[in-house]
């Protein structure tokens, strides 16, 4: 486990070598939230638990949902994904995001359909803000919008990107994070705005 960030009442850890990238958000009030799950390993689960008690495992999309049942059982955590994404995830989802699911008042979900039907981001709203974009955006250097042949709807991705430009945050993480190469902040929101403005003009 590599600690990437420590700010007011929160820390972000990275699970080295995970693809898609897996992160652990530790919030002083909400507890531990695992973002994506790698192939299950009991030793890794024990390491994660030593960092923080995990209350939730959040899947931004189907791409990061690996060995869902095993992680859920080992961590005694509740699994979370959008209602639209649940049918594509192999394993039990306890909380289907449909506008009513809340982990804590300082955290919210941003639906960013497009890469998959139910792609969703997790935002920690307390300043400085932190957003886990999953596959909605991708690290080039800073996160950007990149089209894929198998996008559920690139048009939806563009609409989501426009909405992202109005958000306030300092740190951003995506599924294709590469430790030591990907930039995540501070200054992520402004860098993403610049990238998106350029891409949407192209």
Where are these regions (language model features)?
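Metallo-beta-lactamase
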Residues: 10, 32-34, 40, 69-202
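Histidine-centered catalytic micro-motifs
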Residues: 57-64, 114-117, 176
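Pre-active-site segment of Zn-dependent metallo-hydrolases
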Residues: 14-56
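Short glycine-/acidic-enriched loop or helix-start segments at secondary-structure transitions
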Residues: 44-46, 67-69, 90-91, 142-143, ...
